[in-house]
Amino acid sequence: KVLTYNVEDDADEQRRRLSAALRPFGRFPRDIAGKVIRCGPSGVGTLIERDAMGQITLTAAWEGLRALLTQHRPDIVILDPLVELHTAEENDNTALRLVIAHLRELAQEFRCALILVHHTRKGATAGDMDSIRGAGSLVGAARAAFTVTPMSEEEAEALAISGVQRRHFVRVDSVK
């Protein structure tokens, strides 16, 4: 069972993306009913905040996520995007380590895997661990990290894929 906690995409966009992901397998969302729980963007929010004293604190949204995990007991939780789920300084290694520590404790408590979706910096290079935006401790704390980049014109040409079709392909590189 998978729970997605998505603060960027509305329900229609999430539905479209799930349908698109299933299409190559000849499957439909109804085929996995009850196995994918989609949350957001309404009713979700910032999980971890930095208070006026600079301390990292857990929010009401954190408790809401815990309630969802208690109710659904997912095997995998996808948090998308990480930057929208906390107010810690993105380039502060110490603050990000605390954010990750809370998320790790949550995963351990509920015995689930966490997938944190995070943006790359502008001008990022495919397959480069340093392309991941913000503090290096984010990648350091990860068990595995991947970059996802659109197919380049050069790659499409080499594979004889038309420009129109190119947008349907991405490159996934393991960077850790």
Language-model segment annotations:
Residues 20, 76, 94-176:
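Phosphate-binding/switch region of NTP-binding enzymes
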Residues 2-90:
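Conserved inter-motif catalytic segment of the P-loop NTP-binding fold
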